[in-house]
Amino acid sequence: MMINIQEDKLVSAHDAEEILRFFNCHDSALQQEATTLLTQEAHLLDIQAYRAWLEHCVGSEVQYQVISRELRAASERRYKLNEAMNVYNENFQQLKVRVEHQLDPQNWGNSPKLRFTRFITNVQAAMDVNDKELLHIRSNVILHRARRGNQVDVFYAAREDKWKRGEGGVRKLVQRFVDYPERILQTHNLMVFL
């Protein structure tokens, strides 16, 4: 399958490359491994076991990036304006600080306790062409956050992950790129792990 981005002008070069990577991979064992990794990670995050998430799922060299894009009319695309902005662009140490903030008893945002439910969908997996220890996973996430009976937020995003096999054959997240579609947040905050 090939996408001609000159003809299909709405498709970015990055998206065309990604669809080609996953479209040609038909490995059901790899797909199952990817689904298991994401399901286990989602469970740890849902129960707010953040330290366990860092220890068991996240590699020390991780790059965790959440961006938001500005969607422009076709007539505005001729200008070289920055379309994306970083919401988060963190490494392992910065994620660790954010985890400690979440666990701080003085963090008023967690009182009363928050409840999370994640839905991970559209999971696609493919091995890296050059590094056989690197697994590419594309997925969509819907995150439901509830606090009290009347304060509910729903987040949704597309994710592109890289999971690398390390010591003991365990895969850990080394890169997560989250494309968050809202330019203006409809929620109270984005203090969540997507």
Curated annotation (Swiss-Prot):
Keywords: Aromatic hydrocarbons catabolism, Dioxygenase, Oxidoreductase, Plasmid. Disulfide bonds: none annotated. Pathway: Aromatic compound metabolism; naphthalene degradation. Changing N130D: In strain: G7. It comes from the Bacteria. GO terms for molecular function: dioxygenase activity. It holds the Pfam family Ring_hydroxyl_B. GO terms for biological process: 3-phenylpropionate catabolic process. InterPro entries: NTF2-like_dom_sf (IPR032710), Rng_hydr_dOase-bsu (IPR000391). Changing M127R: In strain: G7. CDD domains: ring_hydroxylating_dioxygenases_beta. Component of the naphthalene dioxygenase (NDO) multicomponent enzyme system which catalyzes the incorporation of both atoms of molecular oxygen into naphthalene to form cis-(1R,2S)-dihydroxy-1,2-dihydronaphthalene. The beta subunit seems to have a structural role in the holoenzyme. Also able to catalyze the cis-dihydroxylation of biphenyl and phenanthrene. The naphthalene dioxygenase (NDO) multicomponent enzyme system is composed of an electron transfer component and a dioxygenase component (iron sulfur protein (ISP)). The electron transfer component is composed of a ferredoxin reductase (NdoR) and a ferredoxin (NdoA), and the dioxygenase component is formed of a heterohexamer (trimer of heterodimers) of three large alpha subunits (NdoB) and three small beta subunits (NdoC). PANTHER family: 3-PHENYLPROPIONATE_CINNAMIC ACID DIOXYGENASE SUBUNIT BETA (PTHR41534:SF2), BLR3401 PROTEIN (PTHR41534). Belongs to the bacterial ring-hydroxylating dioxygenase beta subunit family. This is Naphthalene 1,2-dioxygenase system, small oxygenase component.
